[in-house]
Design a protein with these regions (language model features):
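N-terminal secretory signal peptides that target proteins for export/translocation
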Residues: 1-6
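Bacterial N-terminal signal peptides
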Residues: 9-20
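Juxtacatalytic substrate-recognition/specificity segment
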Residues: 203-329
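Sec/Tat signal peptide C-region and signal peptidase I cleavage site
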Residues: 21-25
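Early extracytoplasmic/domain-onset interaction patches
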Residues: 26-64
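Non-catalytic architectural context of zinc metalloproteases
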Residues: 36, 48-50, 65, 70-252, ...
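C-terminal recognition in membrane/secretory proteostasis and scaffolding
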Residues: 340-341, 350-619
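Post-HExxH zinc-binding segment in Zn-dependent metallohydrolases
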Residues: 275-284, 309-310, 321-374
Length: 619
């Protein structure tokens, strides 16, 4: 063995690899996405990569910013072939990482051509009438070059007659072909495209605002595009309120990208200059439209400042194959989940009563609805996100999931009340946001932070043991919900038999807080609260209720049975199916319907409503 010689060889190989990488970074990679067959849930991709002879490693994006886990949809990458000079280049998937591909580039080859298809077997992002394109799903990239150093020239082919919206600067359009200006890979991945047969753009720029804002809507029908004048005004207010809150913007212009369909996954994903959000087709036509828009679009919009511009250092990585550390998600997502609803209320998308009901619902869900808090603290829901956040099969109340959103909301509401109290009313959460998220607009950029830097900024506004406060809240295994912010804001939680005035998952029926069940319209139990009357009677997640007190199950019959049990001595009888067997579960509950609400505490001033009053002039 010759250790000195071996070290020299290794060093030389490293230098050559870096030199090759530098060469690859100098010339743009071309990616063309042919979405003309998207109605068949298929996109065809052609990639041209400048290369040098020798080993080449290509990656498919694995750790996607905003998704907080290694969930790049690699299983949807199909038909992969490589060619150079009309000759096939063999490839080998890495033995340990399915996102990694190895090739050997022959001498004399300067460009590698890759062709492959991206399929949508579940229709998560595409329907017969629309497409929500995330570029990380359709690109490959060479190893050892940071995403910000790689340049891509992207092109998109759409079905005839389709229109599109994106924050990407356009080079030119010709027929159904769109060419975008050269852009770094990190900004390409950060700039989704929405397109569709039924499409509409609405200007959301407030009067006097120098930066353009718009919402680009693609829907499964023409009628679904009809946003009311009231919602338009409220969305304009949202933009105005964000400027007032943060005192700065960190984008060239901003696009709310909204897909309206019953056939895509419903969620939102944040980006610097846009957000990719999906809601049911008729969302804009319903009386609850403001609640839906305020619940999703406001959250994703706030991420432009909190999560994209200011980002935890451990969530900021140069390569998409590099793991992220997620322990500060209570800041990334939790603070966003607090500010989003606050701005929804300030803008008029939500009424004060809706904001109150929203807070009551998450407080109740984290109290009697989350016995898992007795063993798994808030911090662990953040740390465990990459592997545990979106576990399926029920039992959410016991194992917990993405509670750094809801519990983070209550955490930051308490922070807001502490700032107000400790500063003698001279400072507010708005002042913190302007300091922490402010600064000059250089367009999309990232300014990282650590826990210590977050604490230091808070101390500058309101000297307090912030580190101790956060450590206590993050490590708590109390069964009680963290409602300090609600109570310090002059309100308290009250349970009564009046239903929540909320839609969707927030408007859960009273069986959650009474017998302890979450049940779908088909009778399938999505969750049975551990320790609740229903759980003690033998009901568990994934069972199916087919009968209530001798009658065929409906949600209404179950609700009626819960109400009637208050004045009856007989228990509630449920006939369930589990693993092909019938079982009768007898629930000994006589408390009646229970729904959470906020009520004023007359012994304390109402600071909560001060926080959600409009702050911008444009209302």
């Amino acid at each position: 063995m010759e250790p000195c010689r071996i070290r020299s060889v290794v060093f030389l190989a490293s230098v050559l690899a870096l030199a090759a990488s530098a060469g690859l970074a100098e010339e743009a990679i071309s990616v063309t996405v042919d979405a003309t067959r998207i109605r068949q849930k298929l996109q065809h991709i052609e990639l041209v990569v400048p290369v040098k002879p020798g080993p080449l490693t290509l990656y498919y994006p694995k750790w996607i910013p905003g998704e907080h886990g290694p969930d790049g949809p690699i299983a949807n990458l199909t038909g992969l072939k490589f060619e150079a000079d009309s000759k096939t280049i063999p490839w080998q998937r890495d033995l340990l990482d399915v996102f990694t591909f190895h090739l050997e580039i022959p001498h004399g080859v300067s460009h590698l051509n890759a062709t492959y298809d991206y399929i949508e077997p579940d229709g998560v992002s595409a329907t017969d009438k629309l497409l929500a394109l995330e570029w990380n799903e359709v690109v490959l990239y060479p190893a050892d070059i940071p995403a910000e150093k790689l340049t891509y020239e992207a092109k998109l082919l759409l079905p005839d007659g389709w229109k599109f919206g994106t924050a990407l600067p356009v080079e030119n359009e010709s027929g159904n072909r769109v060419s975008f200006k050269p852009i770094s890979l990190d900004l390409l991945v950060d700039s989704p495209v929405i397109a569709g047969e039924f499409y509409r753009t609405i200007d959301l720029t407030p009067p006097g605002e120098p930066i353009h804002h718009e919402i680009d809507i693609a829907a499964d029908s023409a009628d679904a595009l009809n946003m009311s004048p009231e919602n338009q005004k409220e969305m304009i207010n949202l933009v105005a309120e964000s400027g007032k809150l943060f005192g700065a913007r960190h984008y060239r212009d901003y696009h709310f990208l909204l897909a309206l369909s019953d056939h895509v996954a419903h969620f939102g994903l944040e980006h610097h200059e846009s957000n990719n959000s999906r809601l049911p087709e008729r969302t804009l036509l319903l009386p609850s439209s403001g609640m839906s828009l305020g619940g999703l679009l406001a959250h994703e919009f706030v991420h432009s400042w909190n999560g994209k511009f200011r980002r935890p250092a451990d969530l900021t990585v140069p390569y998409y194959e590099q793991p992220m550390k997620t322990d500060l998600l209570w800041g990334y997502e939790g603070l966003t989940d607090y500010i989003g609803p606050m701005l929804a209320a300030r803008s008029g998308l939500w009424t004060p009563d809706q904001y109150h009901e929203y807070l009551a619902s998450i407080a109740a869900m984290l109290g009697p609805g989350r016995p898992g808090r007795t063993w798994r603290p808030l911090l662990d829901t953040a740390v465990g996100e990459p592997g545990l956040g979106f576990a399926r099969g029920g039992w959410l109340n016991w194992r917990r999931g993405t509670d750094y959103y809801d519990e983070g909301d209550l955490l930051w509401l308490e922070v807001a009340t502490i700032i107000h109290r400790e500063s003698g009313g001279k400072k507010s959460i708005d002042d913190f946001c302007q300091e922490f998220h402010g600064g000059p607009n250089h367009g999309p950029e990232v300014k990282t932070y650590t826990f210590d830097e977050l604490v230091k900024t808070l101390n500058a506004f309101a000297p307090f043991d912030w580190a101790g406060f956060f450590h206590t809240r993050l490590a708590s295994t109390s069964a009680e919900a963290p409602v300090g912010g609600i109570e310090s804001g002059g309100w308290k939680i009250l349970f009564n038999d009046k239903p929540l005035k909320l839609e969707g998952r927030r408007g859960n029926p009273g069986d959650v807080y009474s017998v302890g069940l979450q049940v779908g319209s088909d009778g399938v139990v999505t969750d049975a609260i551990v320790g609740s009357p229903a759980f003690e009677a033998g009901v568990s997640s994934q069972m199916k209720i087919i009968g209530v007190n001798g009658r065929v199950y409906t949600q209404e019959l179950l609700s009626d049975a819960i109400k009637s049990a208050k004045d009856a001595s007989q228990p509630i009888s449920l006939l369930v199916v589990v693993d092909g067997y019938f079982r009768t579960c007898t629930i000994n509950y006589h408390g009646g319907a229970r729904y959470p609400h906020l009520v004023r505490d007359s012994d304390r001033p109402d600071y909560l409503d001060e926080l959600i009053k409009p702050h911008a002039a444009a209302q």
